[in-house]
Each structure stands twice: as structure tokens, then as C-alpha cells.
Amino acid sequence: MSKKYDAGVKEYRDTYWTPEYVPLDTDLLACFKCTGQEGVPREEVAAAVAAESSTGTWSTVWSELLTDLEFYKGRCYRIEDVPGDPEAFYAFIAYPLDLFEEGSITNVLTSLVGNVFGFKALRHLRLEDIRFPIAFIKTCGGPPNGIVVERDRLNKYGRPLLGCTIKPKLGLSGKNYGRVVYECLRGGLDLTKDDENINSQPFQRWRERFEFVAEAVKLAQQETGEVKGHYLNCTANTPEELYERAEFAKELDMPIIMHDYITGGFTANTGLANWCRKNGMLLHIHRAMHAVIDRHPKHGIHFRVLAKCLRLSGGDQLHTGTVVGKLEGDRQTTLGYIDNLRESFVPEDRSRGNFFDQDWGSMPGVFAVASGGIHVWHMPALLAIFGDDSCLQFGGGTHGHPWGSAAGAAANRVALEACVKARNAGREIEKESRDILMEAAKHSPELAIALETWKEIKFEFDTVDKLDVQG
């Protein structure tokens, strides 16, 4: 062994920088944005990322002789400049598929981002995109139902779904919470929702909330003749409690439940998605905590990666921001990861932040959910941006109506149907937005009041996390 094994430390780039390598269709590809410490060559930084996220360690080890390192190692095969940032660069790394457990997003993320982000040789590191090979996608369960099945279950076609988050998000008793749900649904909404942090607090235990909400949903259905639903948040402190809540929602004949997939974790989310698939339940996904991970433009994980991972882990709806509301997100970036939620094939398109072609095969799509600081004036833009396969959720834009939640719901329903009708007639709904809404308001006093109430409410802040494109 001593004749074959050279102990010591060698540069990462000697093994993991392979510019001649041509990625295989079965490779998992990742794009990292890297900013190294001063004086460290780019190739060494990129190779260090490839090594630490695959087979490498800081020292040469004798046990490498017991396996085929050339087969299993990650390979940095390309480096690119980042437009507008002379310190940063993109490192493209190919990983052989055998490095990952089949169907395990938890394992993929543990490998790619689990340890390497703490490297001293790096000042910043960000995972910008992943190309999942179709061979891996076929091992994932994906959405429990998908867009087509969800529309059939809810009997909603030809327009976005319309919903709202119950406000105030915390502090209501179960009975009063149910009353607010009823007011929204009878006013014209399709769905209402628990907020991300309503679980089972002293002021409102989860079982109490579920029972009053179920009563409200069924009463609204009887009055309106429409299928209604409420996203019952089953997120809990243990997996056992998570499933107990899901089972009770099923007993109440509720069509949809909810999970906070980042705080709850991918293992819990995949398990819940599998349960929903077996039990005929729709699954709404909230992205609480995402901005801690994805908002810094140089460090963390881009939301397009988190969105792709969610589609593989499982969910029928996912919050994506609004572009026009109170939350971070520019239009092109948002369209990029909406494509990856809904389409069967998404081509590389740097103008939308997509670094790779992504083939989703036959995996069902996910509804994009627009929620956060939106109101009736935003309706034309939301329809233009998100299209029909989306869910538009107006929380304050429903409950803040001067006449109450039912009137706010009615205003949103009239605005949505007016915009859909105008779009279907060939009108340019964003350019003609004011005319379309004002025409509809002539026949809806609820909409007229809503337009007056929110006519000056805008969220015009510069985007922190911008696309890296040549200007």
C-alpha cells in the first residue's frame, strides 16, 4: 500500500477541476455563485466546493484506494464571470447520480449545501440552480395530485383560484376564526387559509379550529352551491402530531391541508405528501423561513432551487411571492421558478434565472400561489403574471374592506372575473387595468369601495436579489 498511497495535502483543483468533462444526462448539475477569499484562485475555490459537496476532504486518505474516486467525485467543469460583480463567479459542478439516495431531497441538500458553506476559503457561496436528471425525478413522488386533479376536485376552471389568509393571523378563538372563514367563503372566495404560524396555541387549539372551520366551509357550500375549502395547517412539533392532524382533517371531510415545508423539513413534507396521495387530500405548501435562506444575493440558496425541491418532495400549491405586493421578487425571476413549478420542460433562460434545461417528465405541476400585500388594483397584473394555474390570495385585501370580509371577498371575485372576461376578449389587461376595474365597479358597490380604499396603496421598493444579467 505504501508504494501506491501518497500521504499529505494536495490542491483540490488537481482532482476536482475538470474543464474537459462533458456532463452526462444522468448527472445532477449544480450552479454555485462563489466569492473566494483574497488570493485564492477561482479554480481552487470551485474545486473545493465540488470536493466538499461530494467525496473530498482536506487531506489525502488511504481509504480512497478502497473505492473508485474517479467515478464518484463531483467535477467542476465550467467557471463563468458574474455580470456586474468582479469578485464573484459561477461554478458549474456535475455530480454522478449514485451519490444520492433515490427520491430523497433531504439527502441531495445535505450533500450539496450541508457543510461546504462553512468553508474558510469562501467569503460567500450561493446555490443558484440545480438540474435534476430525469432518472432522479422518476424516483420522487412529486405533487400528490397536481393542477388537473385539483381543478377537478374543486370544480374550478378557466380562471385562477381565489383565496385569502384569515386575519388577524393570531389571537382569534376557534369559533370566531370559523366565523371569519364563513364570511369570506360566502362572499365569493374559493378557499381560505391558516397563516403559517397558526398551529395549536393556547388561544386556539388545533382541534377546535378544525371543527369550527369545517362547519363554516360546509355552510358556505350549502349557501353558494360552490365547492369551498380551507387550508388547515397541520404543521406540528412531531411527525406523529402532524399525521394526527391530517387524519382529523380527513375525518371532517375537508379537501385540503397545509404544511410549512421549510420549517417542517423535507423529510416531514415528503411523508405528508405521500399520505395525501394515498388519502385523496390536496396539499397546500407555505414557504415560511425561505427569505432567511434565499434573499441574500451572494449567500444561501436561491428560491428557484427551493421551488424545484418542493415539486419533487410534494405539494399541490406553493407560495411564490406576488411581484406587485409587499414581498421580495422581481417579475422575470418569479416567472422563472413559476415555470419550474408548472411546466413539463423548462429551457435554459438566463433572463429568467434558469441556468439549465430542466425536464420534468410526466410529473404533475404545482399551483403558484400569489400572496402578500395585494388588493383589487393588483388584479390585472396578477392575472397577467401568474395566469390561470395559480391561486391569488388577498388577506388584508379582503378583511380590510370597510364593509367587512364578505364584501372584500365579493370585490375580489368581481375584479377577478372582470379581468378574466377582458383577457378572453383580447384586451390588454395591464394597460387597460383602470378602465376594466372601473367598468366592473359600476355594477358592484363592494368593488367600488375597495378601489377607493386602496387606490394609493403601493409597495414600490427596489429588489434586493436581482438577476445577474448584462445591463
Curated annotation (Swiss-Prot):
Residues that hold substrate according to the record: 115, 165, 169, 287, 319, 371
Entry-linked SUPFAM superfamilies: RuBisCo, C-terminal domain, RuBisCO, large subunit, small (N-terminal) domain
Keywords (A to Z) from UniProt: Bacterial microcompartment, Calvin cycle, Carbon dioxide fixation, Carboxysome, Lyase, Magnesium, Metal-binding, Monooxygenase, Oxidoreductase, Photorespiration, Photosynthesis
Details of cofactor binding: Binds 1 Mg(2+) ion per subunit.
Modified residues (N6-carboxylysine): 193
Subcellular location: Carboxysome
Keyword Oxidoreductase included in the entry's annotation: yes
InterPro entries: RuBisCO, RuBisCO_lsu_C, RuBisCO_lsu_C_sf, RuBisCO_lsu_fd_N, RuBisCO_lsu_N_sf, RuBisCO_lsuI
Reactions catalysed, as given in the entry: 2 (2R)-3-phosphoglycerate + 2 H(+) = D-ribulose 1,5-bisphosphate + CO2 + H2O; D-ribulose 1,5-bisphosphate + O2 = 2-phosphoglycolate + (2R)-3-phosphoglycerate + 2 H(+)
Gene Ontology molecular function, alphabetical: magnesium ion binding; monooxygenase activity; ribulose-bisphosphate carboxylase activity
Sequence positions that bind Mg(2+): 193, 195-196
Broad class of the protein's primary localization: other
Residues at the catalytic site: 167 (proton acceptor), 286 (proton acceptor)
Superkingdom of source: Bacteria
Site for Transition state stabilizer, residues: 326
Subunit structure: Heterohexadecamer of 8 large chains and 8 small chains. Forms a CsoS2-CsoS1-RuBisCO complex.
Entry's family note: Belongs to the RuBisCO large chain family. Type I subfamily.
Miscellaneous section: The basic functional RuBisCO is composed of a large chain homodimer in a 'head-to-tail' conformation. In form I RuBisCO this homodimer is arranged in a barrel-like tetramer with the small subunits forming a tetrameric 'cap' on each end of the 'barrel'.
Function summary: RuBisCO catalyzes two reactions: the carboxylation of D-ribulose 1,5-bisphosphate, the primary event in carbon dioxide fixation, as well as the oxidative fragmentation of the pentose substrate in the photorespiration process. Both reactions occur simultaneously and in competition at the same active site. There are estimated to be 152 RuBisCO holoenzymes per carboxysome.
HAMAP family the UniProt entry points to: RuBisCO_L_type1 (MF_01338)
Protein name from the UniProt record: Ribulose bisphosphate carboxylase large chain
Lineage: Bacteria, Bacillati, Cyanobacteriota, Cyanophyceae, Synechococcales
Gene: cbbL
